[in-house]
Regions:
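Feature for exported/extracytoplasmic and membrane-associated proteins, marking the mature portion
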Residues: 1-395, 399-406, 446-516
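Active-site lining segments that contact anionic ligands and/or coordinate catalytic metals
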Residues: 366-368, 410-412, 418, 436-439, ...
């Protein structure tokens, strides 16, 4: 398995195309922020068929038990209005949406997603329906008659394999280990980020992740750097003053000062280089006042307050979810994953430190930032866990968007979701849902053309789109089509997008159209 940069990344044709793209937008800035929902979020409860006019509403009510589905009236009417205030009609009714995407019938967002619903009405939220891993365009017949062939992704319902499939976006059974963020930075950095102070234009704020793995010689960058040399305390690293004492900055393959030399091309040398780049990322932020000066009485103070207030809201919020064993009762739950707001804050710090101010910062025109949060594998008591997870996600996205707006970058930063796979449309016997295939994804930002994308779903159990009788639906869009639309906005020319997404030309269209 080779991790060497392919020759077609460095041909004169490719280099000229990327150089011209960089020159055309000289001085501009764009950032893609991925939020990976580890465990597979149930998107059928994120975006819900609503109203008698939507033929999928009756299918939804039949397939999902009380305590799993949304929009029920219990005896006390406690939950009767939970969808009434969350409809996604456009200005002209269900036939339109704010950004022009098609909405043939009424739909609603989960009641935990009030802030994202505001983004919808601002035209800043795209809902891309039925996205998933596809080897090539697939029908139920092809899936059933070719069980060991190209129409069935490897270990389709396995978390780890499908997470890698989303993060790598490589052709069927490719031996490579790179991720699509990493390959993007291989393609763009020379001309969009030529003087940056870390090895790569993509950074993970959630630990080392395959999505950011690039071809050699690019090295993964993790922020904040959290790995400490053996025998040293956490306080050993003062990132703004001691990084040159930890390694020889100007000698990429040098060993840390005071440590034995490291032979080239071994695991420890690779680890040292990854750590050095992560330390550099920390230094780039710290050189910019730790991201910002929270005591400056201006923008820094306001940015700090955004995340402090969001954290306070998360830890002080409780939700009442239906008790599936008692139609009169509810379960009260505090919001989990309060740490995720700190992840959003770290993303904001990386974005804030994007530029070159008196020799500090990342000096990047194109940034790709990976983040992730777990807790979405809800086989049991879905609403007790899923509802507060969605509320946390809603608060976190709003905080990051508020910070980006304060920086004047509302149209420059696009946030999008990924997850392992969809969940079964039919609930199971423990008031949860199981592993499935396609699901719905969110894209949020000032450059997003808000609305619904993709045809009306076919939610008939055992129907033409269901490869089981449980509601495991074939994706309408491949992940390549989803990512390709984002890369087009990122100014990668059409002819070069297959370098990042080698299988994209198997699918039509290659641009779904949800970005300006």
């Amino acid at each position: 398995m080779s991790n060497q940069l392919p020759v077609n990344y460095t041909t004169q044709e490719t280099r000229t195309a990327i150089e011209n793209a960089a020159a055309a937008g000289a001085g501009d800035y764009k950032c893609l922020v991925c939020i990976f929902l580890f465990g597979a979020s149930d998107s059928h409860n994120m975006v819900v068929p609503y109203g008698n006019g939507n033929p999928n509403r009756s299918l939804y009510e039949t397939a999902r038990a009380y305590g799993v589905r949304l929009g029920d009236k219990n005896v006390t009417n406690q939950f009767s209005n939970e969808l009434d205030s969350m409809t996604l009609n456009g200005a002209g009714g269900p036939g339109t949406s704010p950004g022009g995407g098609a909405v043939a019938y009424e739909w609603a967002l989960h009641p935990s997603l009030t802030r994202l619903r505001s983004d919808w009405y601002d035209g800043d939220l795209a809902i891309v329906r039925d996205v998933g891993v596809l080897n090539r365009p697939t029908t139920k017949e092809l899936y059933n008659t070719n069980p060991n062939d190209l129409y069935r992704p490897d270990r389709l319902f396995a978390h780890n394999i499908q997470q890698l499939a989303w993060q790598k976006a490589l052709p069927f059974r490719s031996p490579e280990s790179t991720g699509w963020f990493g390959r993007t930075t291989n393609l763009l950095d020379e001309f969009f980020n030529p003087d940056m102070r870390v090895s790569s234009g993509c950074i993970s704020v959630s630990g080392a992740n395959p999505q950011t793995f690039a071809y050699s010689p690019k090295i993964n960058v993790v922020y904040p750097a959290t790995v400490i040399p053996e025998g040293k305390s956490r306080s050993y690293i003062n990132f703004t003053t001691t990084r040159d004492n930890f390694y020889h900055k100007n000698s990429p393959d040098a060993s840390p000062v005071g440590y034995p030399p490291l032979p080239k091309n071994n695991v420890m040398n690779a680890f040292s280089r990854i750590f050095r780049n992560s330390v550099d990322s920390q230094a780039a932020v710290n050189s910019n006042g730790g991201g910002w000066d929270e005591n400056d009485g201006g923008v820094g103070t306001q940015l700090e307050a955004i995340f402090d207030n969001a954290y306070t809201e998360i830890i002080n919020t409780t939700l009442d979810t239906p008790d599936p064993n008692d139609v009169n009762g509810s379960n009260s739950r505090t919001l989990p994953n309060s740490y995720f707001i700190n992840t959003m804050k770290n993303i904001a710090k990386v974005i804030y430190s994007r530029g070159d101010v008196s020799g500090v910062g990342f000096n990047q025109r194109r940034q790709l930032i990976f983040s992730g949060v777990g807790g979405w594998d809800n086989h049991n008591n879905l609403r007790y866990f899923h509802d507060p997870n969605l509320k946390t996600l809603d608060i976190c996205i709003k905080a990051l968007r508020d910070a980006v707006k304060l920086m004047g970058l509302e149209n420059n930063v696009t946030i999008f979701t990924e997850t392992d796979f969809g969940r079964t449309f039919r609930s199971n016997g423990t008031y949860g849902t199981d592993h499935a295939w396609s699901g719905h994804s969110f894209v949020v930002g000032g450059a997003v053309k808000g609305g619904m994308y993709g045809p009306e779903p076919d939610y008939i159990l055992g129907g033409d789109k269901d490869v089981s009788n449980l509601g495991r639906f074939i994706p309408n869009y491949s992940i390549e089509q989803y990512y390709g639309t984002l890369l087009k906005w990122f100014d990668i020319p059409d002819a070069q997008i297959p370098l990042v997404l080698p299988a994209i030309d198997l699918f039509t269209p290659t641009n779904i159209g949800f970005m300006e």
